[in-house]
Amino acid sequence: MKVTVCFGRTRVVVPCGDGHMKVFSLIQQAVTRYRKAIAKDPNYWIQVHRLEHGDGGILDLDDILCDVADDKDRLVAVFDEQDPHHGGDGTSASSTGTQSPEIFGSELGTNNVSAFQPYQATSEIEVTPSVLRANMPLHVRRSSDPALIGLSTSVSDSNFSSEEPSRKNPTRWSTTAGFLKQNTAGSPKTCDRKKDENYRSLPRDTSNWSNQFQRDNARSSLSASHPMVGKWLEKQEQDEDGTEEDNSRVEPVGHADTGLEHIPNFSLDDMVKLVEVPNDGGPLGIHVVPFSARGGRTLGLLVKRLEKGGKAEHENLFRENDCIVRINDGDLRNRRFEQAQHMFRQAMRTPIIWFHVVPAANKEQYEQLSQSEKNNYYSSRFSPDSQYIDNRSVNSAGLHTVQRAPRLNHPPEQIDSHSRLPHSAHPSGKPPSAPASAPQNVFSTTVSSGYNTKKIGKRLNIQLKKGTEGLGFSITSRDVTIGGSAPIYVKNILPRGAAIQDGRLKAGDRLIEVNGVDLVGKSQEEVVSLLRSTKMEGTVSLLVFRQEDAFHPRELNAEPSQMQIPKETKAEDEDIVLTPDGTREFLTFEVPLNDSGSAGLGVSVKGNRSKENHADLGIFVKSIINGGAASKDGRLRVNDQLIAVNGESLLGKTNQDAMETLRRSMSTEGNKRGMIQLIVARRISKCNELKSPGSPPGPELPIETALDDRERRISHSLYSGIEGLDESPSRNAALSRIMGESGKYQLSPTVNMPQDDTVIIEDDRLPVLPPHLSDQSSSSSHDDVGFVTADAGTWAKAAISDSADCSLSPDVDPVLAFQREGFGRQSMSEKRTKQFSDASQLDFVKTRKSKSMDLGIADETKLNTVDDQKAGSPSRDVGPSLGLKKSSSLESLQTAVAEVTLNGDIPFHRPRPRIIRGRGCNESFRAAIDKSYDKPAVDDDDEGMETLEEDTEESSRSGRESVSTASDQPSHSLERQMNGNQEKGDKTDRKKDKTGKEKKKDRDKEKDKMKAKKGMLKGLGDMFRFGKHRKDDKIEKTGKIKIQESFTSEEERIRMKQEQERIQAKTREFRERQARERDYAEIQDFHRTFGCDDELMYGGVSSYEGSMALNARPQSPREGHMMDALYAQVKKPRNSKPSPVDSNRSTPSNHDRIQRLRQEFQQAKQDEDVEDRRRTYSFEQPWPNARPATQSGRHSVSVEVQMQRQRQEERESSQQAQRQYSSLPRQSRKNASSVSQDSWEQNYSPGEGFQSAKENPRYSSYQGSRNGYLGGHGFNARVMLETQELLRQEQRRKEQQMKKQPPSEGPSNYDSYKKVQDPSYAPPKGPFRQDVPPSPSQVARLNRLQTPEKGRPFYS
């Protein structure tokens, strides 16, 4: 345990262990600590006579401490000391051995002896409460510190009287010894509480200090609320020069100055006159302004002028400069001007109006009287009854407003000010029979022990319904009891439960009652039991006490003249007319925060910019969170412009500065006060405007929703210089600027926003939007983020069509205003699957499996036509307009496509509108897309996007994926491979060196190529245009959009089938040409296989073996295997080198290509790794009659259909081979060892078709590397398909002929077989006729010998 021993004002905490120690030991330890506290050495003499308990009991020196004292008790030491230090309160003892000079030492004479003489029994005085009430010649000082130099007894007994320190009596009131001013004038005033007394205090005379060491109504030591100090307040005297003012320092600092209270006492009874006005429904004919004192306090309404011929002038009801301080039972003092107007309008609904008026002659006296009440006003303005009516406005006195007529139905609040006005009206409306007493200053010296709070607060009655998650809050208590009882406080609000759902209970609230049971004296465990006793689904009633902070708002660009009484020379527009004449109103809301952290204020804001000059128009409310403080308050609306927040103006600032001001003010002031004060500008419709000043609302005018008493309206004349706040009601431009209808001028509310500004669009209510648009519709700022229904181009074109009265905003459409399945309202699971009603629409979801791309699309505004707007068609985001919304990922963009398609906005057939390309696309992907969309023909544009029957989930993947290993879907795998390779090859410029006929052919091929665009491109193709010629399509865009809507789904299916048949017919024709070439190539391949290095060339074509080496030489098997291993390391076939040919060759042929095909096939048969075989094929096509096969393999054609066509083509193979063989030129063989491939290309230019294929990078993937190695990117899907078909054909021939006849063993066949098995084997030389073409039977026998019996089928 530990106790606190008080030596005068110095408190020493002494640890006592378990308390089993004597009081004598405690005194010794306390003295030692006291010496250290006052910085004295151990020889400093201190004598402690006794220790007294707080309740007055004296502790015996032999008592055990734990028996006579409790833990944390405070004990008072009655002591003497050698040389009292001059340290004041004893808490600062840094000046060791030094003393401050005595200012008044000379005036005190030579009596420098200490007031604390050695202890004498006769000098001991027992001070008790009864003794304090007696007339003892004791003088009370500010402190009982022994540092005060004692005064002689003659001084105490002499005729000195004390006065309260004030500006009239600047008595020094501190711990330093001072002098007393002799009382020569005035007599002390007394109150009925205590008598006129003088006291003298010694350190031993402290038995009456028991209260100061307890947490009760006088917990602070001898503070201003202490009863002994209260004597100073009760002995107030008026000095002879009481009217003079002195601005010197008044002590004690912070004490209420009483010097101003002794001016001549003007009572409100002498000033106020009562004016009774019968209400006949007509206007009063007065113009009023707020009447403010010099300190800014509102003292009422000042009658500025009277209308000529009005009721007030005719009946002589008021005079100019009269001050109205009360209307009926509503006090107008210390009220905001908006509240005063509200009370004025309420009074205009009563049959008789009682005005309490201070005449103009007494106005100065009334203002002086208000100054004497100022301090008391600030101490009581935050009473529980006036928490929302106090002076919290942005400008308490100077807001000059043209106001609207009454809107409220409910009667005004019954609120008492700090001083009651006379003539307090009775419910009947008549004045009382006797006036109330004049205001007096009452100084309370005690505070209720039940509250004991630093700030004055309010009581709240809260009912919570206990559910399955409990009440949802926790409680705590103080560790030190107050007067024997521990207060119970709400510790925190749990994230689930009744408290957070209700939203009114706050952390820090003090519980007063639970279900009517007073909690005073109850422990925390008892309160918990009481709360837990509430049954399930039962209601618990809580009475809580909440402390309130004073809120002094900042000025809102208010001029000093506005804070004072308006002068007669002011302009007429500064007068306040109580009738509206504008088109918008300014409202003030004080929104209480939840303080539970559920949603903060709960609003999302946006910044608007002007379309003409890009000027910032202000901050507007974008949306309101359902469940937030603003939603529960219910008064803030979407598109309200924020004028000021917590007294800080947002006008005249850029949107960025205003947003920063908004964040800072809401995060500091809002959290500090628990309430956010908002001033907003809201448009009013003309039908709600009233006519006459001060007149009650007529029956023909509907009464709108009642405003809360915390609501106010302020002047638009104060903000007349702001852009968009024009007073002309005929200008729709001002309305559009102030309301911001387009909904797209948004700064991102989710970037660096505090928790109070978290953006969660969860409001189920329809936004209240103006019915008219303007021709000044603004464009979106670049910070626009999110999926917004409104479109900037829509507003712009609608304004062109009808600038005065345009069609309704898309936001007004209730169908578009709220969509449960709309974008931004779906969870992650709903975005993927839930919103699609049938399986066919899931194709858009499957596109999310494609690789992500950064598709940044720049803004484009003109998307819809004027005709569409006039026709009343809803403005929706279709086609490229979806891309205008900046999307954080491809997935969110595809979700937008899926949603619009689900709603029927994207028909199956759509011309491709052009959009300028943004940043970040992959170059190869962009090039492929650009080629697909590059200048489509107008006639054939309808054939842009096709869907084939083979579309599956796999077909929607990106074309850059590797070849599939699924053996049951070779055609699909090849198809994806071809899509990827041919899209990569689309970078070339096909316009180079082409005739008009070739260009037309290329366009036809590009159209065919579009038919194979699948998967992701199928969805994105309806949205984006990645091409370059953006402006070319603007003329055709309107017609195309109309055409696309005229097609039905049935016509689309028919057209798709016809197009597919046409594509298949073209593919069949092309493959027939390929088959003829292959048959001839096989015959030549037979010749090349049996040829040798030393044989003569025929037709200028050297053998394949001769192209690989300078002179054929036998190679050992070891060398052959080493070479094979070397090629295998780079995953390249050994025999894939291109054959350098003679420099005298006149025309290249396709023999070499067929030969390499054959050798690579044999090499693949010997390879055991299936995966390696799939990646080791790349072929050249240097034959002159090669056609750019851009169509082959682009669509899924089954192998069975291809084999059927192949069998038909075999019958013509012999004739075709014979014709081509006979047409070859004859030329003698030359050594080709020294001729490189580059020299061959330079000396002999190939034919035109081959030259174009060679120069075009589109076909670069068809050709291998010039050094004979395969390029890693050189896979060609078309050649792979040809190889697959060839191998399948040969496999079938082998199986058929093996059944008919056994294989023959010829030396040439054997040599060929050995050559395939061992590449180093050189066949024996022998005569062979090269001028006779081989028969097809030889090719068949060659296939049987060269193909192993257990060869594996080749799959790509």
Swiss-Prot record:
Note the Gene3D superfamilies from the entry.
2.30.42.10, Phosphatidylinositol 3-kinase Catalytic Subunit, Chain A, domain 1
Record carries keyword Cell cycle: yes
Positions of region (Disordered): 81-100, 154-262, 408-448, 865-886, 932-1025, 1129-1356
Q: Which cysteines are joined by disulfide bonds?
A: none
Residues where N6-acetyllysine is found: K834, K851, K885, K1350
Q: How is it modified after translation?
A: Acetylated. Deacetylated by SIRT2, thereby inhibiting Schwann cell peripheral myelination. Phosphorylation at Ser-827 by PRKCZ and PRKCI occurs at the most apical tip of epithelial cell-cell contacts during the initial phase of tight junction formation and may promote dissociation of the complex with PARD6. EGF-induced Tyr-1127 phosphorylation mediates dissociation from LIMK2. Phosphorylation by AURKA at Ser-962 is required for the normal establishment of neuronal polarity.
Where does the record place the modification Phosphotyrosine? Y489
- Where along the sequence do coiled-coil regions lie? 1049-1077, 1151-1174, 1201-1224, 1280-1301
- Record's disease association: Neural tube defects: Congenital malformations of the central nervous system and adjacent structures related to defective neural tube closure during the first trimester of pregnancy. Failure of neural tube closure can occur at any level of the embryonic axis. Common NTD forms include anencephaly, myelomeningocele and spina bifida, which result from the failure of fusion in the cranial and spinal region of the neural tube. NTDs have a multifactorial etiology encompassing both genetic and environmental components.
Its annotated function is as follows: Adapter protein involved in asymmetrical cell division and cell polarization processes. Seems to play a central role in the formation of epithelial tight junctions. Targets the phosphatase PTEN to cell junctions. Involved in Schwann cell peripheral myelination. Association with PARD6B may prevent the interaction of PARD3 with F11R/JAM1, thereby preventing tight junction assembly. The PARD6-PARD3 complex links GTP-bound Rho small GTPases to atypical protein kinase C proteins. Required for establishment of neuronal polarity and normal axon formation in cultured hippocampal neurons.
Q: Further remark, if any? A: Antibodies against PARD3 are present in sera from patients with cutaneous T-cell lymphomas.
Q: Which protein is depicted?
A: Partitioning defective 3 homolog
Question: Organism source for this protein?
Answer: Homo sapiens
